[in-house]
Every structure is written in structure tokens, then in C-alpha cells.
């Protein structure tokens, strides 16, 4: 499973990219607004920090506006993936942009039917929102499993990009359910490495090495 980081903080992206564990980045207008910087400037800087896909979202909701903004975003860098909302206008724009060779991430997916439509529209990625489904007491992981089965049944190439990831347990369950990609905030990705027994074991090893005077 590929790991994308969900942030517009370029320092966080640079730090995580240096680990070699990050395969791409997802952003949205809300995340970029927090930076207080011009939209295109932030996207360009992020694209320079990773070779992987960088999702940049349109703010238009009509077909012509999405096409205009999508083409503008795609010109920022070769690794930009245009992020579109899961609406009929968004799916129409998805079909048109992907036909032109532009990668598209269809976002705000909350049902298997929506995911099926996105795949038929040629989406590069579909982003089901796990945490937001949990908020309304619907099992987001069941949705991942349903999408996985449908895509496998019909050999769709659209990748399942699990979003709204809020905990290490979400990451584990997405991997078990067959998500191709998960995107999570930097804090969640960093928390994946932690385990109390790892910390305890390391503490013991270091104490024993110091006691024995071991140097490498």
C-alpha cells in the first residue's frame, strides 16, 4: 500500500520525504489556506519535494470552471493530480481531463456506487472518506472492501486512495481491506512507528550496551 501525506506544510513534507516512506501528497483548499501563501506557489513547492503524485483541488463546481482550473493546475508540474468533487459535473470533467492525459483524483466519495461512477469516468484515484463515515456510524472499512471487490470484478485501473485517516488503526484496516493508497496527516504517519515494547526494548539494549562499555 502506498503512503501519501495529507498536508500543505512543506516542512512536514520534506521531513517525511527524507524517510523514503512517502509516495505522494494530497492537499485541499482548506489545508493550503492555512499556509497563507498563494495556491500555485504552494503546489509548485510541494511538487518539487516529491516525485510522486500531488493532488491539487479545484474550487469551481461547474464543468467549464473545473476544466479551466484543472488544466491550469496540471501546468504547474508534471506530477500534479487534479482533484475533483464527486458530482455529475465533476465526473464529466474527470472524463474530459483524463482523456487529455491528466491524472484525476475524485474526492468526497462515500458510497460504492459513487466509486463505480468515478472508475467509469476514468479516475486515476478515488478517495473514500473513512473518518467522516465513522462520524455518522457507518463502517468506512466496509466501503473500502466493497470498492475493492467491484474494481477487481471489472478490472478497473482506478486506485483506491483511502482518505480521512485519523489513526494507526485506520491505516492497518485499510491495508487489510485492500486499499491501494492511504493518505494521512503527518502526525498519524509518524505515530505508525511507535510501540511501547519497541521503546522498552531499545531502552534495555542501550542500558546493557552502556553497562558493558560497548562501542561501535
UniProtKB/Swiss-Prot annotation:
Pathway: Carbohydrate degradation; pentose phosphate pathway; D-glyceraldehyde 3-phosphate and beta-D-fructose 6-phosphate from D-ribose 5-phosphate and D-xylulose 5-phosphate (non-oxidative stage): step 2/3. GO terms for molecular function: aldehyde-lyase activity; transaldolase activity. PROSITE patterns: TRANSALDOLASE_1, TRANSALDOLASE_2. Keywords: Cytoplasm, Pentose shunt, Schiff base, Transferase. It holds the Pfam family TAL_FSA. The keyword Cytoplasm applies. The active site is at residue 83. One of its GO terms (biological process) is carbohydrate metabolic process. It catalyses: D-sedoheptulose 7-phosphate + D-glyceraldehyde 3-phosphate = D-erythrose 4-phosphate + beta-D-fructose 6-phosphate. Its EC number is 2.2.1.2. The keyword DNA-binding does not apply. InterPro entries: Aldolase_TIM (IPR013785), TAL/FSA (IPR001585), Transaldolase_3B (IPR022999), Transaldolase_3B/F6P_aldolase (IPR004731), Transaldolase_AS (IPR018225), TSA/FSA_arc/bac (IPR033919). GO terms for cellular component: cytoplasm. It is found in: Cytoplasm. It comes from the Bacteria. CDD domains: Transaldolase_FSA (cd00956). Transaldolase is important for the balance of metabolites in the pentose-phosphate pathway. Belongs to the transaldolase family. Type 3B subfamily. This is Probable transaldolase.
